[in-house]
A protein has these predicted regions:
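Short, well-ordered beta-strand segments in beta-rich or mixed alpha/beta enzyme
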Residues: 3-11, 39-73, 109-112
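Compositionally biased, low-structure terminal segments
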Residues: 8, 12, 20, 27, ...
Length: 114
């Protein structure tokens, strides 16, 4: 059973440029450490304000979720970047979702660009 690990970070809008510059460094860190490549997004419309960043990745097991969080938590490079980013946070939290797979259900088809 697969799981989605998601970090949600609401940051001060006036610090967006500095926050995103640090986030780019986190993306580079993921590549260097060969960690799961997260997908970053921000709300365009919805409940969360636009000055919210979501990082998420899909992992095959709950153990893999725990291993990923543990690897990030004990990594000194990650800790250094996080210490620089925390002052911009208004709030941050972690979510874990179970991926639902219904037998016989077909995946959504992608629309072609015109």
């Amino acid at each position: 059973m697969a799981y989605v690990l998601r970090f949600v970070q609401r940051f001060r809008a006036e610090d967006e440029a500095a926050f995103m510059a640090l986030e780019a460094q986190f993306a580079a860190l993921e590549r260097r450490k060969r960690w799961p490549r997260g997908r970053r997004s921000r709300p365009f419309a919805g409940r969360e304000p636009v000055h919210t960043l979501m990082w998420e990745c899909e992992l095959p097991t709950l153990a893999a979720v725990n291993d990923t969080v543990a690897a990030m938590a004990k990594d000194p490079d990650h800790a250094r970047l996080l210490r620089r980013q925390i002052p911009f946070f208004l709030e941050a939290w972690t979510e874990v979702y179970e991926v639902l797979d219904f037998p016989g259900a077909r995946p959504a088809r992608r629309r072609r660009a015109s």
